[in-house]
Amino acid sequence: MNAVSQRVLGRDLFPLLRPLHRLANALLAAFALASCGGGVGELVSGVGSGGSGIAEGTITGFGSVLVDDLRYDDSRARLKRQSATGETSVDSLKIGQRVRVVSTQAGIADSVEVLADLLGPVQEAGAAAGGVQWLRVVGQWVRIESSAAAEVAPTVLDDNGDNCGNDCRPIGVGVWVEVHGDWVFDSGKQAHVLRASRVERASPSDQVLISGIAQQRGATVRINSASGTEIKLAGDLATAEANQLIRAWIPAEPAVWASVSASRAIRGSLAASPGSAPAVLGGAVDEVDGDAVVINGTRIAIPKGFAGTRPERGQTIRAEIEKTSEGGWQLKAQPSAPEGSSRGVVKIESEISGSEASRLSAGLKLRGTAIAGVAADKLAAGGCTAVAASAKVKVSITARRGPLPLQADSVSCRAD
């Protein structure tokens, strides 16, 4: 409706049309999402469509890409990550990776940035106990969760993945890994530790990636504890703020991790720039005080008069946030716990051939995720046993996070 039409109809009528305008936009966005090839079928249970702006969290599924159970069509998105030399492209996304989605249209991703926290050799590998295993990677503590630790989602463990080459021993001391997750304070270690959402074998490199929570402001800072690794910053981030998440690349592998010099450092916390749109931030709550919560080094103020339930330390949440007048972030709505955040539910949808569907009993990869062989009764219940080899099949699998290949809880097939 143009300005002339508004004047003809009068100012009182135009507000009445706004709900219809919003409904039309929502229908158009839903149609675009369904028709552009990023997703298949209806939204699976508990999954909503993401909005525009920024969303940061953990990949919980595919078909399009699910970030803390919010769906974004990634079929035309630019996939990228940061490296020691700057931004580089990425071929694919993986379950359990931490990512940052930027979108200018609701539910449609313009870019997806992979946010790894550690890359380098394992120095220590403890035995699993009580559903938890501890690693020390590039001097930092990593907590691996198994399905026995029911209070949080299990870690996706890509033990013998595509990069193991001729050395496919289990992940342990000396093996290079890439780790994703959330930084939380651990009272037992008296340090911030990386609660891992994904640990995968990686190829050795001439640069290691180290990250953590800065303990003080400065150009040289310690991370994760008062006696943690000291990093001399360089590159994009010359000075860090206290309690900020930083990521830094270190040339080669130092003999000790007490003090290192970065070739490049960047801010890991979510920045609230002057033009920041509302954002969604998911992860484990690291800190709660009277007027704020902290997730991965990002402080989120709790507005005065907030009537909702305050998140608890260690709880995994998804928070809708907005920029404050002071330049930070504040809660915009009551935080929610993404469905399956405590149980580690993974949802994967993909289009495969009928011949591939016939091999579900032996196992296969869907969207780059290895799925173990599916039991015959589950295949029959999901309509996956009587599919023509030449048919196009939309398959949907629900599984549990954990070591690859993932074990399917349920599967459904629909032939076109």
What are these regions (language model features)?
Residues M1-S35:
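Sec-dependent bacterial lipoprotein signal peptides
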